[in-house]
Swiss-Prot record:
InterPro entries: Ribosomal_Su5_D2-typ_SF, UDP-acyl_GlcNac_deAcase, UDP-acyl_GlcNac_deAcase_C, UDP-acyl_N-AcGlcN_deAcase_N
Annotated coiled-coil segments of the chain: none
Task performed by this protein: Catalyzes the hydrolysis of UDP-3-O-myristoyl-N-acetylglucosamine to form UDP-3-O-myristoylglucosamine and acetate, the committed step in lipid A biosynthesis.
Organism name: Xanthomonas axonopodis pv. citri (strain 306)
Protein name as catalogued: UDP-3-O-acyl-N-acetylglucosamine deacetylase
Claim: Nucleotide-binding is one of the keywords in the record: no
Pathway: Glycolipid biosynthesis; lipid IV(A) biosynthesis; lipid IV(A) from (3R)-3-hydroxytetradecanoyl-[acyl-carrier-protein] and UDP-N-acetyl-alpha-D-glucosamine: step 2/6
Keywords for this protein: Hydrolase, Lipid A biosynthesis, Lipid biosynthesis, Lipid metabolism, Metal-binding, Zinc
Entry's family note: Belongs to the LpxC family.
Catalytically driven reaction(s): a UDP-3-O-[(3R)-3-hydroxyacyl]-N-acetyl-alpha-D-glucosamine + H2O = a UDP-3-O-[(3R)-3-hydroxyacyl]-alpha-D-glucosamine + acetate
């Protein structure tokens, strides 16, 4: 039996937007069953709600952004990843600005926030999206693919011509569970290259970026004094992003995901292609008295 989950208590955090550089106040609130993840722009009059829905994705350049009724919500992927990692189905995310706080560039601070708020089970079974047929999307040599699988498995390969990202550290696989997510993925930070800084600044991107919330590389090395948290932190962060992007499908995935040089755009294209092909997936749940789901979530955290 696996039930839907929400937060036990309301919790707040403050930070800056990675791309906007704006200070943002964020409040996470419990939500009822079947509510899903919904963002709320409380700085707008009237308040605008933006559901966490792959069909509402309008921005995929260096982040995943949603637009609904003229209101934007940007850089949702790290919080969505933490929610997926801890199995939280229903939550209201109130924001005082258009962009979520970047925190330390990983999903670790969001995991801590969610655990601090407490996670409780609700009265209805959790709904999973089970992959029943292979779905693949491409963009040049980039590939993202779903395949049927008993569980949730993610594999990712990156290719960067950089001495700090050798081929042997460019591949990672994870058999998804809450404990594997928290230990192996959640602390991996976003990263960027000094050579891309001018491109980003011209587009008003990365204005809140610093070595406090990203790994920064020049042509030869990592510039952060403390170095890396994992030897292959870069590809682990790509899995962190993918878990968040895929959670915009509207339910927890049961299947195998494979990404080769994929990013936010291709991940979103994959989710849209999946949802458009009704023969490729089905809703499943595991109510009391039935089989256990092939994915392990941590026991609820009662704060």
């Amino acid at each position: 039996m696996t039930q839907q989950r929400t937060l036990k208590n309301t919790i707040r955090a403050t930070g800056v937007g990675l791309h906007s550089g704006d200070k943002v106040y964020m409040t996470l609130r419990p939500a009822p069953v079947d509510h899903g993840v919904v963002f709320r722009r409380v700085d707008l009059e009237p308040v605008v709600e933006v559901p966490a829905d792959a069909e509402l994705v309008t921005e995929t350049t260096l982040c995943t952004g949603l637009t609904c009724n003229g209101a934007k919500i940007q850089t949702v992927e790290h919080l969505m990843s933490a929610l997926a990692g801890l199995g939280v189905d229903n939550v209201i995310v109130e924001l005082s600005s258009a962009e979520l706080p970047i925190m330390d560039g990983s999903s670790g601070p969001f995991v801590f926030l969610l655990q601090s708020a407490g996670i409780v089970e609700q009265s209805k079974p959790k709904r999973f999206i089970r992959i029943t047929q292979t779905v693949e999307v491409r963009d040049g040599d980039k590939v993202a693919r779903f395949e049927p699988y008993e569980g949730y498995k993610l594999g990712f390969t990156i290719e960067f011509n950089h001495p700090m990202i050798p081929a042997k550290q460019s591949r990672q696989e994870i058999e998804f569970s809450t404990s594997a997510y928290v230990k192996e993925i959640s602390r991996a930070r976003t990263f960027g290259f000094m050579r891309d800084l001018e491109y980003m600044r011209e587009r008003n991107l990365g204005l809140g970026g610093s070595m406090d919330n990203a790994i920064v590389l020049d042509e030869f090395r990592v510039l952060n004094e403390d170095g890396l948290r994992y030897t292959n932190e870069f590809v682990r962060h790509k899995i962190l992003d993918a878990i968040g992007d895929l959670y915009l499908a509207g339910g927890a995935i049961l299947g195998a995901y494979e990404g080769f040089k994929s990013g936010h755009a291709l991940n979103n294209k994959l989710v849209r292609a999946l949802l458009a092909d009704q023969a490729a997936w089905e809703w499943v749940s595991f109510p009391e008295g039935t089989e256990q789901p092939p994915v392990t979530y941590a026991s609820p955290v009662y704060a």
